[in-house]
Amino acid sequence: MLASCGAKGRFDQVDDGKIKLASSLTGKRDVILQEVLNKYNSRKAKDDYPIEITKIAGSYDGGRSDLQTRLSVKDKTTFYNMILNYSDTISTLGRSNMELPLDSVDVSQFSENFLSFNDRISGISRKGIYGIPVSMSTDILVINGPVLHYILNSAKKKDGAVTKKNASNSNGNEGTLTVNNDQQTTELWKKIEEAAKTNGKTTQEQTKRDAKQSTSLIQLKEGSANTTEGNASESDKEIKKSWGNYQEVDGGLKGYTFKASVFEN
């Protein structure tokens, strides 16, 4: 994204003879970016401005905050000319009339699919190319182990005889979900169970602390906190208070086979 200057409603930046690129990248990505700019600066035309990195702390959120601050105080001396961030920062520039279209830049090497986000930027009245993709973000999938355990364990078909404890977990519904027995799924299911056990143990310890501080002390059953199965059950019981009873429905987990591969993308 580029910042402009000079027009009505905007402010002029001091011409310091260089292009400042704001970046919040760290680690290897920061090193690679600097190497690319070093190569550009060594090969650029004599009269072209060199590019210099302005480091911003706080990742992309820090970049957004820094941009808003510099615009609000009309920073003319240390403000940057470009920023590596998401497209919503173009809207921020647009509110101060500081957006700059890349009309003279050759973007023919970019797929239109990667540039189409420019048509969906709020606050920008004039259509144009205001930002170009320079890197890929990493998609991260985070699994809440204890919650997933409650859902799957409630939906799971019980092995062998149904004990009173298992019956209470199924909330009156006989589960039909099965866990696939391939190695990857088995290992994942063990991790999910361990997450539930850890959560259950933490919950029981907190319950004990609360009970000691309470005037109406509730006697906990001895030994229940020391069983790993009890810990997982305690976790399920607490999560059930927020999520409610599991209900088996068509199109849901009824007859479903849980596999670790479902999380692959």
Swiss-Prot record:
Residues 162-183, 196-239 are annotated as: Disordered. It comes from the Bacteria. Pfam families: Lipoprotein_X. Residues 165-183, 213-233 have a biased composition (Polar residues). Coiled coil: none annotated. InterPro entries: Mycoplasma_lipoprotein_cen_dom. Belongs to the MG185/MG260 family. This is Uncharacterized protein MPN_146.
